[in-house]
Swiss-Prot record:
PROSITE patterns: RIBOSOMAL_L24. It comes from the Bacteria. Signal peptide: none annotated. Part of the 50S ribosomal subunit. It comes from Fervidobacterium nodosum (strain ATCC 35602 / DSM 5306 / Rt17-B1). One of its GO terms (cellular component) is ribosome. GO terms for molecular function: rRNA binding; structural constituent of ribosome. One of two assembly initiator proteins, it binds directly to the 5'-end of the 23S rRNA, where it nucleates assembly of the 50S subunit. One of the proteins that surrounds the polypeptide exit tunnel on the outside of the subunit. Belongs to the universal ribosomal protein uL24 family. Gene3D superfamilies: 2.30.30.30. This is Large ribosomal subunit protein uL24.
């Protein structure tokens, strides 16, 4: 299955405690069907000091979200949208916004 959301995309959370927040996708975990979004789903982790540079204590970091909890934000219309696929004349497959019809992939 083709990936509708990729690393570097801007997404909006549509359900849960962070509903309405937007952020950039840092990492996609396809086997787990999850992704990590910058500034969303922040959790606190208790960390031991390791080595000389690492400081211990309580740190905040982003936890993974399920794909179904986010929608891609179209760069042209700036709205959360569903994603479709089109095949161009040159044979390349691109993602497009289902609200405004603009191509999302940058080339």
């Amino acid at each position: 299955m083709a990936q509708k959301i990729k690393k570097g995309d801007t997404v909006q959370v549509i359900s849960g405690k962070d509903k309405g927040k937007r952020g950039e996708v840092i990492q996609v975990l396809p086997k787990e069907e999850k992704l990590i979004v910058r500034g969303v789903n922040i959790v606190k982790r208790h960390q031991r000091p390791t080595g000389q540079m690492r400081q211990g204590g309580i740190i905040e970091k982003e936890a993974p979200l399920y794909w179904s909890k986010v929608m891609l934000v179209c760069p042209s219309c700036d709205k959360a949208t569903r994603v479709g696929f089109r095949v161009l004349e040159d044979g390349s497959k691109v993602r497009y916004c289902k609200k405004c019809g603009e191509i999302i992939d940058k080339k």
